[in-house]
Amino acid sequence: MFSRRYHIGRLYHEVYLCRRWEGNSDAALSQDRINKNNTYKDHLRTLEILARQQLNRSREQVPSPAEVEDFFQNEKKNWSDAAARYEALSGVQTKVLAEGQKLSTVNSQLSTLSAQWNPARMVSTGANISKQAIEKRPCFLCDSNRPAEQHALPVLGQYQLLINPFPILPKHFTIPTREHTPQTIKGHFQDLFKIARQMPDYMVFYNGPLCGASCPDHMHLQAGSRGIAPLERDWKSVYEPKLKPFAEGISILTDYACQVLVIRTENIAEAQKRFDYIYNLLPLHEGETEPRMNIVCWKDGEEVVTLVFPRAKHRPDCYFAQGDEQLLISPGALDMCGLLITPREQDFRKLTPEMAIDILREVSLTPTLSQGEGAKAF
């Protein structure tokens, strides 16, 4: 371990220089002794190379469920601030806005929606993501700017698994790239798919730059506990039977607060092909680098279910309203899945099923269908 942390040190020279030539202690030894010493050093070098190869292979993979659980518990044990927020999360107030058929009279939608009053999320909901604000603040996902207590678990070689210190879900992770690159799903969709497949206890999600990402200058995914967000929790019993064909290999969910495009497959290449179809179908807003969307994935049997939420707006009008008309809700992937996050108590108390549905519909992009068999336009 010493040689892996420091470039200069006794073990480093022992392992990597390996041979000791004229001018040092081996020069005075017999040839037989020198050969034995060199054999021993070569053996050390081989052990170190094999250990590094194994370490590199592990970094190229998704951590096992046991590794993720151990990491999560260790982070809470050693990071008191984060542990306190997870403890507080168990006591946050939630309320069911509507259940199943009760919403059938509200905008003709069959939905289950919930709200969570989570004051700690003000840091995200209230985030200023203007270009000027981003340029002025250090990136909190880069290694050099993270708290000393926050450690990382390598994922797929180019990502790091971090405990999210401002959780929404009982277990909540941020998965940033090791390099500081802008938030974009292009080139990262298959990684999202792989992580969801290898972390079956979690839903893995992506917030676009203007769709809930509080750090749009650094590419990151997120993962969190399953069985909490209503759309994922009730998928098999309520929503999956309601799917309709949209395009080849793609379904659409219309019996929900907003329309959702759905990909179900165990084949990663097929998933990429179907996602590319959706990606290329969505409009690109002027001055932006990718279509607006949220994506949520989870493993369902052998398949991975991928939900794509096309977005029209970053935040609803009520976010910018004044006085009693204001609702400080900035929808991300979890909000789109029916768990609306309200940092302020007054918004939590005031939010109704009708308001929640109106917010999700307002920020969503609704496709124009051609006889229910595909999209004409967005």
Predicted regions and their residues:
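Active-site beta-strand/loop microenvironment that shapes enzyme catalytic pockets
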Residues: 198-232
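An anion-binding catalytic pocket shared by soluble metabolic enzymes
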Residues: 195
